[in-house]
A protein has these predicted regions:
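N-terminal leader/linker segments that precede catalytic domains of diphosphate-processing enzymes
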Residues: 1-165, 172-186, 194-237, 251, ...
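Short aromatic/basic micro-patch
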Residues: 248
């Protein structure tokens, strides 16, 4: 990727890039085309299961009841982790759960944020359960102090999801036992080589909720957005091999890329949140995009 030259964030090029209303990610964020049945734990709908996969759950009727209105987990709280370990391993063998990662993720109640069980990360999309993500817009100021450049990463071609697509400087899922902030600090080093003192400068944006069909099932995710200004001389360097390259893009070029399928849906929405909060898009287009993005934002836990 090519580093920027100084770009005025009020330049005509930025305004032109900001005229687009057809942001791919805004349409994709809630696209639901496959029929799914609610997945209920302790009386709360915590996810959903694709109706074509309901028959695969029949062998575990002792713990998982497939009812007309919902799939209900009847296993006790003490049994759940072991039940999920057994069931998910078999579903993985059958090819219904893909991209196994050996990362424990919490099964969260969307209403309360409480943890109802712990299972393998890759299983969340089969069950359509809520996951949390932490993403960070890395930005650099121009001579006037306004955002002139955004650090944009390209995902490794070997990534399990969205290989080779453009991404935010930092982004990742929040595993069991970590908060979004703690996950962000960890990912800051793994993905960009930034230490905790540098990451401490990050400031929060909004929380964006996706609930959409994906090849693995259903992505039901709350993205916690952060911004981090990188100072002159601070150069991100990937540490974990999950980033193919990273570069500093003029804001107008980052905006144009984020509006297309070249960038992941998650990263596109996180980038748009940054552009809107910092008033970098031309009105009245900004107002129309803000109205659409605001519908995706949540104050839920």
């Amino acid at each position: 990727m090519t580093d920027r030259t100084a770009v005025d964030p009020a330049s005509p090029r930025l305004l032109a890039a900001g005229q687009r209303l057809d942001w791919h990610a805004l349409t994709e964020a809630r696209k639901q085309q496959r029929p799914r049945r609610a997945f209920v734990v302790d009386g709360d709908a915590v996810g959903s299961v694709d109706e074509v996969h309901l028959s695969a759950l029949q062998p575990w009727g002792r713990w998982i009841e497939v009812r007309a209105e919902a799939v209900v987990l009847t296993a006790s709280a003490a049994e759940r982790d072991a039940v999920f370990a057994e069931v998910n391993a078999r579903l993985h063998e059958q090819g219904l759960i893909r991209a196994w990662r050996d990362e424990p993720f919490p099964l969260l109640c969307p209403r309360t944020g409480q943890v109802r069980a712990v299972f393998e990360r890759a299983c969340a999309r089969f069950w359509g359960t809520l996951t949390l993500g932490a993403h960070c817009n890395g930005w650099q100021a121009g001579p006037d102090g306004q955002a002139a450049g955004l650090w944009i990463a390209r995902r490794s071609a070997t990534k399990a999801t969205d290989p080779g697509k453009l991404d935010n400087l930092i982004g990742g899922g929040v595993p069991f036992g970590q908060t979004p902030w703690e996950a962000l600090v960890r990912e800051g080093f793994e993905e960009a080589g930034l230490n905790p003192d540098q990451m401490a400068r990050a400031t929060p944006g909004r929380v964006i909720e996706l609930n959409r069909d994906v090849p693995e099932g259903r992505q039901f995710e709350r993205l916690h957005v952060f911004d981090l200004q990188l100072l002159e001389g601070e150069q991100p360097v990937n540490q974990d091999g999950e980033v193919a390259e990273v570069g500093l893009w003029p804001v107008d070029q980052a905006c144009a890329a984020a509006a297309t399928e070249e960038m992941t849906v998650d990263a596109s929405l996180v980038t748009l949140d940054f552009l809107l909060r910092r008033q970098l898009l031309a009105p009245p287009t900004a107002a129309a995009l803000e109205e659409r993005l605001a519908r995706l934002c949540t104050a839920a836990p």
